[in-house]
Amino acid sequence: MMIRAEDAGHGEEQTLLEWLAAQPGDPSFYAFLALLIFFGLLLHMGVHRTIAKTLDDRAEGISNELDEAKRLREDAAEMLASYQRKQREAEAEAEAIIAQAKTEAKSLKAEARKEMTERLERRTAMAEQRIAQAEAQAAADVKAAAAELAAQAAEEILKTQLKKSDLNKLVDADIKTVGQRLN
């Protein structure tokens, strides 16, 4: 593209690029010019057709998605009705099961109460028997401890109050008594 120099103010002809290069220019002017060139290239390459086709394809896709959504909504409504019907049937069945379970629970409760009473009676009897055994054992232990304590006390008394000669006499007397008992 040629530009007359008179328009540019020089008096000779220049190309547009020469004229632009000679401009001491404003950067915003060059940015605007670059933008125009960029858009011109895009139009030349047919980008607008590609964009239009993409938008048309997108619109068709959205239309298809809306149709699919409508179909899915109808299917969902049918499924909801089916599930509500099944839920009502399940609730009726559950009520019947609950009634049967209550009846069985009552009989199991009575049986468990009877078993518990029997177990409690057996455990009470066993506990009473153990207590009686423990009492007998305790009485025997007390008697043994008392006898041992009495023997120790007697030994201490004898040691402190009797002389050695008296002790020998007692031992001799006990030996005679043991001898007589053995015969």
Swiss-Prot record:
Protein name: ATP synthase subunit b 2
Function: F(1)F(0) ATP synthase produces ATP from ADP in the presence of a proton or sodium gradient. F-type ATPases consist of two structural domains, F(1) containing the extramembraneous catalytic core and F(0) containing the membrane proton channel, linked together by a central stalk and a peripheral stalk. During catalysis, ATP synthesis in the catalytic domain of F(1) is coupled via a rotary mechanism of the central stalk subunits to proton translocation.
Keyword vocabulary terms for this entry: ATP synthesis, Cell inner membrane, Cell membrane, CF(0), Hydrogen ion transport, Ion transport, Membrane, Transmembrane, Transmembrane helix, Transport
InterPro entries, alphabetized: ATP_synth_b/b'su_bac/chlpt, ATP_synthase_B_chain
Stated family: Belongs to the ATPase B chain family.
Membrane topology value: Single-pass membrane protein
One matching Pfam family: ATP-synt_B
Native organism: Maricaulis maris (strain MCS10)
Recorded coiled-coil stretches: none
Subunit architecture: F-type ATPases have 2 components, F(1) - the catalytic core - and F(0) - the membrane proton channel. F(1) has five subunits: alpha(3), beta(3), gamma(1), delta(1), epsilon(1). F(0) has three main subunits: a(1), b(2) and c(10-14). The alpha and beta chains form an alternating ring which encloses part of the gamma chain. F(1) is attached to F(0) by a central stalk formed by the gamma and epsilon chains, while a peripheral stalk is formed by the delta and b chains.
Gene this chain is encoded by: atpF2
